[in-house]
Amino acid sequence: MIFGELRRLYLIIRVFLSYGLDELIPKTRLALPLRLWRKCLFWMPNCHKDEPLGARLRLALEQLGPVWIKFGQMMSTRRDLFPPHIADQLAMLQDKVAPFDGAQAKKLIEHSLGAPVESQFDDFDIVPLASASIAQVHTATLKENGREVVIKVIRPDILPVIKADMKLIYRLARWVPRLLPDGRRLRPQEVVADYEKTLLDELNLLREAANAIQLRRNFADGQMLYVPEIYSDYCSENMLVMERIYGIPISDVATLEQHGVNMKLLAERGVQVFFTQVFRDSFFHADMHPGNIFVSYEHPEDPQYIGIDCGIVGSLNKEDKRYLAENFIAFFNRDYRKVAELHVDSGWVPADTNVEDFEFAIRTVCEPIFEKPLAEISFGHVLLNLFNTARRFNMEVQPQLVLLQKTLLYVEGVGRQLYPQLDLWKTAKPFLENWIKDQIGIPAIVRALKEKAPYWAEKLPELPELFYDSLRQHKHLQHSVDRLTTDLRGERVRQHQSHYLFGVGATLLLSGTAVVLSRPEWDGLAAGLIAAGVVAWLVGWRKTS
């Protein structure tokens, strides 16, 4: 490692230890080297002993920057893994990160506008409405139409911090295949590259604006999800302006209940929104933590989600979507043979995998899951169990599925927080079955014909000419084949003749030589035989050339 990376690694270790996060090291024999290593760093004491562990973890991640804050946001949705006092603190990373100075934010906005804030906006609030890992948000009113908007501005000097951390993580990832038996199959560098791309994409607010416009268009005709309007004329790489929305944070269950929101329908609708994005649109909001999701105050009996912060989106290709949907259905039907075959067919495991052994391994790991009621089974954990089992059969990590799995865990966490009895399988199964039928049945054929209709309408007038050209090319090809066949037949005849002449010539030469050796007085006959042999050889050689 170069000096800069070592310095950053030292800083990370110092921050973690200064907040006493060594308490998280498990007291097991396997973790003994880590505990010994901690004792060696005795000059780095816990400087925040008065703070609870959850608060110390949150503050440490905030101090380390956006790469670590994003990780904390992801952990905050896993309330099945962390006690409430830690999960509640991590949830604050979603929209309550320490803000930077509002006056500095105003200067950044004016730099992006190329004009004073007052020239485009009224009522600009220098106090941020919310602050997150990548950017913070200020409220204002558009001068041109009086509409309330929020202005999102990227944090200053954030790019060097992200690049420094990612460079360090890349270097550590290169060691994973050398240190872990399964390291190569984990494809750590590819996973890190995917995570880095996700972070860097968030720094380009023009990309976020385009994502929001696409997502808004996808749900324009439905009641399930509302995406605020983007004011593209004011957007740049470092600044985004969008409609201000008023809604109830999805994590504020008490307020949702006070407003009479149908919690069961709201939870089920969240699952439907996710699967609609993934399978119908092939374009899904991949940062659906509670800080980015609200519920409209209107129509609480028919609740509508409001989604913001579209900086991270994901997509699956047609094949991955089909394999994923069929995997879910086969799993919940306990058809483990089908699950194994799908993993092989998709290329997720090598083609030479023993399907019987793979099926048995899946059955062994997954059958105990069905001891629980279906309402308690986690889709995210199903994927995790399947992929962990497949790793034993040389499955490589599929980066395109990592984002999906993370988002699915978000959706599950939020859904069960809203309605603990949520049965994800009951909600998702009809959608998945209908989607598969739609992909392979008559509707799929009709849809394909409709999609190709403009192409065929353009090509139809050209068909007679194309048909004539095809016949002409076929005729020319047939002439060429006939000519080649004749030439090949003649070549074979010539080769046969030359081989025959070589044989005759060799026989005459040997006969002439034998006569010379046995009957010197017959030298005339010998000379004739030898001469005839030479002539036969020359004629045979000429035919071969």
UniProtKB/Swiss-Prot annotation:
Pfam families: ABC1
GO molecular function, one term: ATP binding
CDD domains in the record: UbiB
ATP-binding keyword on record: yes
Keyword Endoplasmic reticulum: no
Active site annotation, chain numbering: 287 (proton acceptor)
GO BP: regulation of ubiquinone biosynthetic process; ubiquinone biosynthetic process
InterPro entries named among the record's database cross-references: ABC1_dom, Kinase-like_dom_sf, UbiB, UbiB_bact, UbiB_kinase
Cellular localization per UniProt: Cell inner membrane
Membrane-topology descriptor: Multi-pass membrane protein
Binding site for ATP: 129-137, 152
Enzyme Commission number, as recorded: 2.7.-.-
Residues of the Protein kinase domain: 123-501
Keyword terms, alphabetized: ATP-binding, Cell inner membrane, Cell membrane, Kinase, Membrane, Nucleotide-binding, Transferase, Transmembrane, Transmembrane helix, Ubiquinone biosynthesis
Pathway entry: Cofactor biosynthesis; ubiquinone biosynthesis [regulation]
TM helices/strands, residue ranges: 498-518, 521-541
EC supergroup of this enzyme: transferase
Family, similarity comment: Belongs to the ABC1 family. UbiB subfamily.
Reported function: Is probably a protein kinase regulator of UbiI activity which is involved in aerobic coenzyme Q (ubiquinone) biosynthesis.
Entries under NCBIfam families matching the protein: PRK04750.1, UbiB
Protein name: Probable protein kinase UbiB
Gene expressing this chain: ubiB
